[in-house]
Amino acid sequence: MAREKEIEIQTRLGKQRILPSKVIYFPRGIMGFENQHEFTLLKLREDAPFLVLQSIDDARLGLLVADPYSFLSDYQIKVSDAEQKLLRLRNIRQVAVLVTVSIPPGQPDKTALNLSGPILVNHEAKLGLQVPQVEGKYPAQVYVHPQNETKVAAADARHPDDGGAENW
């Protein structure tokens, strides 16, 4: 079997090498960046609960994302039949759910998860889709408070199917 050749991409964090099989195609782009279709997930650190959803074509476009279930065990989203079809979902184990994260400069205690625009990734088909939520149990943003020990430990971030983001 031939070994896959890495590609080099530019990011705000410098050059990164990734495998082409790690590229995720977003047919609709991401809200606010509808013309950007190819992204990859990059780890910041081995033990970090956050990833960067990095544009392949625009070094300046990298969104901080996290697995919401690491912080909210009962987070629920609604996905239409059309969205499931676009993602080519055959079963729930194919999908990873991510949400964008905002950390105000100098205020890590105000870190917030954006729950109104979850990003779904079919890791088998390498397809992604942002699925806006209009109704939900949670407000649009939920603050992550590190001192709150009742939440699942952030270091235990997991994708539902593969045991962790480290397999991306």
From Swiss-Prot:
Gene3D superfamilies: BH3618-like (2.30.290.10). This is Flagellar assembly factor FliW. It is found in: Cytoplasm. GO terms for cellular component: cytoplasm. It comes from the Bacteria. One of its GO terms (biological process) is regulation of translation. The keyword Repeat does not apply. Acts as an anti-CsrA protein, binds CsrA and prevents it from repressing translation of its target genes, one of which is flagellin. Binds to flagellin and participates in the assembly of the flagellum. InterPro entries: Flagellar_assembly_factor_FliW, Flagellar_assmbl_FliW_dom_sf. Pfam families: FliW (PF02623). The keyword Chaperone applies. Belongs to the FliW family. HAMAP family: FliW. Keywords: Bacterial flagellum biogenesis, Chaperone, Cytoplasm, Translation regulation.
